[in-house]
Amino acid sequence: MAYPFQLGFQDATSPIMEELLHFHDHTLMIVFLISSLVLYIISLMLTTKLTHTSTMDAQEVETIWTILPAIILILIALPSLRILYMMDEINNPSLTVKTMGHQWYWSYEYTDYEDLNFDSYMIPTQELKPGELRLLEVDNRVVLPMEMTIRMLISSEDVLHSWAVPSLGLKTDAIPGRLNQTTLMATRPGLYYGQCSEICGSNHSFMPIVLELVPLTYFEKWSASML
């Protein structure tokens, strides 16, 4: 989860988020090198007295500044496309959960079970217990098994929403009349918080998401108690 005054990303809890962090570092290094080169050239232009006012063309320079940016863009695009394909790939999910956005709460349905569904509302500030997080706690958490491929089917009953859990690298739009899907797999147990990431009305800020990732045996006990 996020911490006060945090500048970086949340800790990665899924293979997708780990890949996104590596891609961010890769891209940031390219941006740093380009920025350093530009600042170096600007400093040279400001400090040197040599000018080339009579130069009409320089084919070598033009070739370099055409080919070099193309190579840089390829170095950025290839890993980006790889991650995009990884995010769209869903192979033999062990569990499917249908998520519906409402103004202003989420509803969940475990489609592999006959009657396992519930609504998830934010707990008001005045009802929080000591140690609970303001604007992030819900009355019904989404309990899921860890280290298993889970397919999330996401849609909306009214307006545009967006189901997002940063530490898992997830952000999928909930669109009325359309069913989007994404996959998640957590590498360790814990509570993972998210929020609606699409402005959806006056209470947009009060649509938290809480995932509770547990070992499979605990999930089986929980699902049996809910039926």
From Swiss-Prot:
GO cellular component, one term: respiratory chain complex IV
Membrane topology: Multi-pass membrane protein
Gene Ontology terms for molecular function: copper ion binding; cytochrome-c oxidase activity
Residues with PTM Phosphotyrosine: 218
Cell compartments where the protein resides: Mitochondrion inner membrane
Domain of life from the UniProt record: Eukaryota
Pfam assignment, any one: COX2
Keyword annotations: Copper, Electron transport, Magnesium, Membrane, Metal-binding, Mitochondrion, Mitochondrion inner membrane, Phosphoprotein, Respiratory chain, Translocase, Transmembrane, Transmembrane helix, Transport
InterPro entries, alphabetized: CcO_II (IPR045187), CcO_II-like_C (IPR002429), CcO_II_C (IPR034210), Copper_CuA (IPR001505), Cupredoxin (IPR008972), Cyt_c_oxidase_su2 (IPR014222), Cyt_c_oxidase_su2_TM_dom (IPR011759), Cyt_c_oxidase_su2_TM_sf (IPR036257)
Membrane-crossing residue ranges in chain numbering: 15-45, 60-87
Residues at which Cu cation A1 binds: 161, 196, 200, 207
Mitochondrial intermembrane side: 1-14, 88-227
Binding, Cu cation A2: 196, 198, 200, 204
Amino-acid positions noted as binding Mg(2+) in the UniProt annotation, renumbered to this chain: 198
Cofactor: Cu cation
Signal peptide positions (record): none
Protease recorded as keyword: no
Assembly with partners or alone: Component of the cytochrome c oxidase (complex IV, CIV), a multisubunit enzyme composed of 14 subunits. The complex is composed of a catalytic core of 3 subunits MT-CO1, MT-CO2 and MT-CO3, encoded in the mitochondrial DNA, and 11 supernumerary subunits COX4I, COX5A, COX5B, COX6A, COX6B, COX6C, COX7A, COX7B, COX7C, COX8 and NDUFA4, which are encoded in the nuclear genome.
NCBIfam families from the UniProt entry: CoxB
Entry function: Component of the cytochrome c oxidase, the last enzyme in the mitochondrial electron transport chain which drives oxidative phosphorylation. The respiratory chain contains 3 multisubunit complexes succinate dehydrogenase (complex II, CII), ubiquinol-cytochrome c oxidoreductase (cytochrome b-c1 complex, complex III, CIII) and cytochrome c oxidase (complex IV, CIV), that cooperate to transfer electrons derived from NADH and succinate to molecular oxygen, creating an electrochemical gradient over the inner membrane that drives transmembrane transport and the ATP synthase.
PANTHER family recorded: CYTOCHROME C OXIDASE SUBUNIT 2 (PTHR22888:SF9), CYTOCHROME C OXIDASE, SUBUNIT II (PTHR22888)
Entry protein name: Cytochrome c oxidase subunit 2
Annotated source species: Felis catus (Cat)
Record gene name: MT-CO2
